[in-house]
């Protein structure tokens, strides 16, 4: 009905069993940080980081681009090794894109398209800046959609941290 729209779909650890697999055209797939908290979801004999990597990467074949942001170089290398035969373009944090904090209110993003000095979004934790940088890396790869650097600069100033990490300012929950 709305062919110009982009849908952002999240699937969890067991993506290969997820209903989102009905989507046949992926513009990009993002492999977010693999954490040991996923181990408890696996059968006892399969509770390894390698099994988590398999579950998160086994259905990436129909993606044009794969973006990966991991917490350690070892996990990042393991993911790269796992998807080496995948024909998708691979964009890896700290290899193909990165960010740095140099001033209180700014962070610097850099990828193959160049560097951006960006207003630091209203987010309390550094891992959230990692997520923002991964989103920027993704949108800059989608060159057919003509998202400009100005769009990115404006967009990140509008980010709000709601739900799990929301700072409650008033109300009954704040009073607890």
Regions found by a protein language model. Give the residues of each.
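Conserved AMP-binding/adenylate-forming
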Residues: 83, 88-89, 133, 140
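A short acidic, often aromatic-flanked loop/helix-cap motif at beta-alpha or helix-coil junctions
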Residues: 97-102, 173-174
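Flexible active-site lid/hinge loop adjacent to a nucleotide/diphosphate
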Residues: 2-74
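A conserved beta-strand/loop element that lines the FAD pocket in flavoprotein oxidoreductases
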Residues: 89-95
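Short, aromatic/basic amphipathic alpha-helical patches
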Residues: 74-85
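Nucleotide phosphate-binding/pyrophosphate-handling subdomain across enzymes
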Residues: 5-6, 18-30, 35-39, 51, ...
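Acidic-glycine-rich active-site phosphate/pyrophosphate-binding loop
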Residues: 101-116
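Feature captures the FAD/FMN-dependent oxidoreductase FAD-binding
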Residues: 1-4, 99-101
């Amino acid at each position: 009905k709305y062919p110009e729209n982009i849908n952002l779909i999240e699937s969890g650890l067991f993506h290969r069993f997820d209903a989102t697999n009905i989507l046949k055209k992926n513009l990009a797939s993002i492999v977010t940080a693999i954490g040991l908290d996923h181990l408890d979801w696996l059968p006892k004999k399969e509770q390894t980081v390698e099994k988590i990597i398999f579950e998160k990467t086994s259905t990436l074949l129909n993606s044009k681009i794969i973006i990966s942001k991991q917490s350690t170089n070892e996990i990042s290398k393991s993911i790269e090794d796992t998807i080496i035969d995948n024909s998708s373009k691979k964009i890896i944090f700290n290899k193909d894109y990165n960010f740095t904090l140099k001033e209180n209110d700014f962070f610097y993003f850099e990828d193959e398209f160049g560097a951006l000095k960006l207003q630091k979004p209203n987010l309390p934790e550094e891992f959230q800046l990692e997520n923002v940088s991964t989103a920027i890396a993704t949108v800059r790869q989608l060159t057919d959609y003509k998202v400009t650097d100005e769009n990115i600069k404006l967009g990140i100033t509008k980010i709000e941290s709601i739900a799990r990490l929301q700072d409650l300012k008033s109300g009954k929950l704040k009073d607890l």
